[in-house]
Amino acid sequence: MPESTNTIINSSVKKIKLSALCELCHGRKAVMKRPKNLMKLCKECFYNIFETEIHNTIISNDLFYRGEKIAIGASGGKDSTVLASILKTLNERYDYGLNLVLLSIDEGIKGYRDDSLATVKRNQKQYDMPLEIVSYKDLYNWSMDEIVACAGIRSSCTYCGVLRRQALDRGAEKLGIKHVVTGHNADDVAETVLMNLLRGDVARLESSTNIMTTSAGSPIKRSKPFKYTYQKEIVLYAHYKKLDYFSTECTYAPEAFRGTARELLKSLESIRPSCIMDIIYSGEHLVLAPKKQKRKTVAYKNKNKNKKKSNSEQEEQEKQEQEVNPDGSISLNRNGIKKDGNTCEKCGYLSSNKICKACMLLNGLEINRAKVTIDNNSAIDGAAKLTKKLEQLSF
């Protein structure tokens, strides 16, 4: 073969090899295109960028302080598994000085949560972290399978969302922890922004886009270190690191409104890859400027019309002043209904209202319990499937 021909072949091979190299280190073979910016990276460079970005998010938002005890909301899924792995790595690498604990919620979904908890228990040994499991059955005397059998599958996420948030708070309080971190990622935040906009619930944008939030009346704060991290990158990190996680979707998730928002987000992302971050930034800027507004009652307005009233009468009317919170709830003083920091009259847990949301939902279930006959555990096991089939029938 002529020398010139060999030169052409060798140069073309060299070009192919150069195009397959990592765009960051230019020394190792690229194994992926980063979803966030389509950059070709090798595994080592991807690990470094992924971990460094999360470290920068933690530092820039002052999420933790030295010596703080942190509960990691662990479900066994990819997000919480990667979160536990990353926090352990960063805690050791940058000497955060954190005391990390795994906190899991057992909703009582047979064939799903029992398998995922087995993954969490393996993670406990792998990461050498304490594990606390809190169950719906112990806290509320209801499992999610029983709730679905009573209320229907379409209401499952409404009940589970409220009960899970309170269960996380109670589990953290039991451990003496004031800070819970969750694996909510950029896709989750963008989906929540879309859901709130589609429902016309602009008041909830602040809590859905904040990296750190608290529940009304609760001293437990929650943070999202993965707020700016794409779900695809979390999956890639778990895959290349060969992390042990549970990948099955919740039995009741397909019926949730979030699934509709997720499909919409995927369609938008296929057209504009940056739409996830764009939606998050839009949600942050769409937050209502006044965090709290004063809404005057009729009695309070009448006070200004009659200036001859005594000071004592005026003070009495001021007690009727209502404060509207960002989430749309109303906090009254002790002579009204409730004030932030008080407790639910039924369960005794912290609540800004007379009766907490969890107790209101559970009370409705108790009323309907008599209408549902559950013979044994096997009937409960198939309750979700039976309910789903019945709801698909048309008469």
Curated annotation (Swiss-Prot):
InterPro entries: CTU1-like_ATP-bd, CTU1_C, Ncs6/Tuc1/Ctu1, Rossmann-like_a/b/a_fold, TilS/TtcA_N, tRNA_thiolation_TtcA_Ctu1, UPF0021_CS. Residues 297-335 are annotated as: Disordered. Keywords: Cytoplasm, RNA-binding, Transferase, tRNA processing, tRNA-binding. Its main location: cytoplasm. The keyword Ion transport does not apply. Pathway: tRNA modification; 5-methoxycarbonylmethyl-2-thiouridine-tRNA biosynthesis. One of its GO terms (biological process) is tRNA wobble uridine modification. It is found in: Cytoplasm. GO terms for cellular component: cytosol; cytosolic tRNA wobble base thiouridylase complex. Its EC number is 2.7.7.-. GO terms for molecular function: nucleotidyltransferase activity; tRNA binding; tRNA-uridine 2-sulfurtransferase activity. The keyword Cytoplasm applies. PROSITE patterns: UPF0021. It is an enzyme of class 2 (transferase). Plays a central role in 2-thiolation of mcm(5)S(2)U at tRNA wobble positions of tRNA(Lys), tRNA(Glu) and tRNA(Gln). Directly binds tRNAs and probably acts by catalyzing adenylation of tRNAs, an intermediate required for 2-thiolation. It is unclear whether it acts as a sulfurtransferase that transfers sulfur from thiocarboxylated URM1 onto the uridine of tRNAs at wobble position. Prior mcm(5) tRNA modification by the elongator complex is required for 2-thiolation. May also be involved in protein urmylation. This is Cytoplasmic tRNA 2-thiolation protein 1. It comes from Candida albicans (strain SC5314 / ATCC MYA-2876). The gene is NCS6.
